[in-house]
Design a protein with these regions (language model features):
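Conserved redox-active cysteine motifs that mediate thiol-disulfide chemistry
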Residues: 61-75
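Structural micro-motif
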Residues: 105-113
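Non-catalytic, surface beta->alpha helical segment in thiol-disulfide oxidoreductase systems
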Residues: 116-141
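Conserved helix-turn-beta segment immediately C-terminal to the redox Cys motif
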Residues: 56, 73-92
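A short beta-strand-turn-helix
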Residues: 39-56
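Short, Lys/Arg-enriched N-terminal segments with co-localized hydrophobic residues
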Residues: 8-35
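Short pre-active-site segment immediately N-terminal to redox-active cysteine/selenocysteine motifs
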Residues: 54, 62-65, 108
Length: 141
């Protein structure tokens, strides 16, 4: 066991991580920090992050130069808080991760896919408003 000391209080490793998790939850609850759950994944990590996920995953196929993708980004951050614990949200940069883009026949961006149990459940191509994305997620999880 590793002992961690904070303010002269000792914690075993497991207790320390529970303490950190509890502290973060309090900070989120009081809006001191945001969830920021939109995570970037890669060709290498896609199966582990998305296909093997216990939760449904909303994935945005995006690129740095894509204007509509940049418009959706902040909406996805908001939705990550609203759907916290119900879905995970990932982004895949198609320029850097072409294998995944080819595997899922991505021909236009932004493309949003909802994947559950390793299977594509729904797909949306193009920009969307927050209300459209809420409806898309709610109807497909």
């Amino acid at each position: 066991h590793v002992l961690v000391f904070i303010n002269k209080q000792s914690y075993k490793t497991k207790e320390f991580f529970q303490f950190i998790k509890f502290t973060i939850s309090i900070l989120k609850k009081n809006n001191y920090i945001k969830n920021m759950s939109v995570t970037h994944t890669t060709d290498k990590e896609f199966d582990n992050d998305v296909i093997q996920s216990d939760l449904p995953v909303l994935i945005q196929f995006t690129a740095e130069w894509c204007g509509p993708c940049k418009m959706i980004g902040p909406i996805l951050e908001e939705l990550s808080d609203e759907f916290d614990g119900k879905i995970q949200i990932y982004e895949v940069n198609v320029d850097d991760n072409s294998q995944t883009a080819v595997k899922y026949s991505i021909r236009s961006i932004p493309t949003l896919m909802l994947i559950a149990d390793g299977n594509v459940k729904a797909q949306h191509i193009g920009a969307a408003s927050k209300s459209q994305l809420i409806e898309f997620i709610s109807n497909n999880i």
